[in-house]
Amino acid sequence: MEGVAALLRWYVEQGVDETIGEQPIDRFAAPPPSAIAAAAPAASPAALRAPTPLRTTPPPSPSRAPVPIESPQLVEDARALAARCSTLAELETAIRGFEGCALKRTAKNTVFADGKPDAPVMVVGEAPGADEDRLGKPFVGVSGQLMDRMMSAIGLTRDGGFYITNILFWRPPGNRTPTSTEQGMCLAFTQRHIELARPNVLVLAGGVAVKAVLDTTEGITRLRGKWTSYRLGDGTVIPTMPTFHPAYLLRTPASKRQSWQDLLAIDKKLTELG
């Protein structure tokens, strides 16, 4: 019915005011169209001009930044550069000067770490958000504030209780998923970061961090709350606790109870380690 109504509206717009004439017309006896056209006066050039066709295709969308090409060599370059760093200061300088990762080209700031490097606990999150990108520090937005309150509940602060970073040092444009090359490059620096910080306890916040650092396909819901180990290059084993990312807790408040259990386990482990 909508199609019929649209057709009738079109007829009205074209000036049609009747559907059936008062007198019948014998179309077979009418002269052919060619004869009518020949008898009609010549149309002006303006009348012969073809009407502007309606656009039938949508206008082109704005071009997007091309997805970086995967390159295993870039990952190897990052590993080699990270291995040459013997201090955290050298590592930070190397990361800030590294131009191989496409994420850096669209980020406002390099987000390295925050807190005391010699703190007993090192937290590794996922990626900088808009607030972190703007300020150049990890976990400073709403989820970061929740992280601070959580750690404070077991007596840990950034002033000396815990040291915090992410596996990515630059915010992905539009929060897109990083490519395997981008993640591999950043992971090379993160692994060296953990080596140099040598915390007593390592906390991995979020499924992305857990899968990358532990090199596992297991999901965060199956791993959280269970102690595992992270082994350094010299054989040192660091007790490691996978836990939910605070951003997830903001979306799923019911999971805060499980995270509280994780925090209590971390507090107990620190007591055991002295």
Protein language model annotation of sequence segments:
Residues W10, D17-E18, E22-G274:
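A polyanion-binding, active-site-adjacent surface
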Residues M1-L7, E13:
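Conserved nucleotidyltransferase catalytic core and NTase-mimicking acidic/glycine-rich helix/loop elements
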